[in-house]
Amino acid sequence: MAETQVRNFNINFGPQHPAAHGVLRLVLELDGEVVERVDPHIGLLHRGTEKLMEAKTYLQAVPYLDRLDYVAPMNQEHAYALAVERLLDIEVPKRGQLIRVLYSEIGRILNHLLNVTTQAMDVGALTPPLWGFEEREKLMVFYERACGARMHAAYFRPGGVHQDLPDQLIEDIGKWIDPFFTTLKNLDDLITPNRIFKQRNVDIGVVKLEDAWAWGFSGVMVRGSGAAWDLRKSQPYECYSEMEFDIPVGKNGDCYDRYLIRMEEMRQSARIMRQCVDLLLGKERVGPVSNTDHKIVPPKRGEMKRSMEALIHHFKLYTEGYHVPAGEVYAAVEAPKGEFGVYLVSDGSNKPYRFKLRAPGFAHLQAMDFLCRGHMLADVSAILGSLDIVFGEVDR
């Protein structure tokens, strides 16, 4: 009898695959239906962001950050603004901090809604995305009313935020919060007990805590494995230290735990939003939203029409930009996907000398081989969905 040669089978997953979430290409080595090896090929969305930012003034660099994790753009701007503010040694007024926190949490909900509902869609549930996107639409409108853009906001600037929020907008955000809890409960009732969803996610992609630290995981990926590590609590920035919220922590470190954590984080984000809205309509109702140093923050239009000095400040800001004292700084925020960090080196000029981005998705994607080995081919899309990867920040 002739001996048949059994060999492993190589297939491409993506870049055109609907579950590949963008331009991911995975080269999978399969033994039957079992995954033996995963080789992620990245760089299909590389735009040279870091280098481009080194040729721009500090203000012109802001829009590049929106185009990294474009699902929750303001959270990226936040890290950059914090880094520049630390080098300049300037304070953001309380009202400005509250607006930043409010919009960071809106970004977190935008991100988690997209992730949770598309994760459900990847394993075959078609209702959740329709419900989730209805809520995301309302939040996108809040983005638009704050800064004029639904996605690429350029709203958080070094020194504060671009413009104050009208009271009506803050009231509308307040009115959105309570009905959102009902929507979340509906989503919860639909997905959480679902037998098929559980079979596709429980005990899939398990990460032990020591492995999570070793791979450089952060955010939900670490909390799913049992560590209560959240930069908003452990290294508070802005006014997070004054906010009341809980950190949900998983115990199994599988895809299902990560899903549950994202669901609970949306509730906690809504709690933080409620506190911000109450303060913004209460004792912080009036006040500046950005630093009053006009060498860094442009003066108001009305002021420019009256004062020659204000006009000169405005002209200098938008042509030459401000000079940042020489030094280096690392600023990180708890972005929806994990720890988003900005390492900034200034040489005293009006442009950054070196600009390094620490994208959480990059660290998560590099563990794809470690996570998928020994799983079935169908589990790859479930694992990928639970990592929450957006290619803008991975390839940058």
Swiss-Prot record:
It is found in: Cell inner membrane. It catalyses: a quinone + NADH + 5 H(+)(in) = a quinol + NAD(+) + 4 H(+)(out). One of its GO terms (cellular component) is plasma membrane. GO terms for molecular function: NAD binding; NADH:ubiquinone reductase (non-electrogenic) activity; quinone binding. InterPro entries: NADH_Q_OxRdtase_suD, NADH_UbQ_OxRdtase_49kDa_CS, NDH1_su_D/H, NiFe-Hase_large. It comes from the Bacteria. It is an enzyme of class 7 (translocase). Belongs to the complex I 49 kDa subunit family. NCBIfam families: NuoD, PRK06075.1. NDH-1 is composed of 14 different subunits. Subunits NuoB, C, D, E, F, and G constitute the peripheral sector of the complex. PANTHER family: NADH DEHYDROGENASE [UBIQUINONE] IRON-SULFUR PROTEIN 2, MITOCHONDRIAL (PTHR11993:SF10), NADH-UBIQUINONE OXIDOREDUCTASE 49 KDA SUBUNIT (PTHR11993). This is NADH-quinone oxidoreductase subunit D. It comes from Brucella abortus (strain 2308). The gene is nuoD.
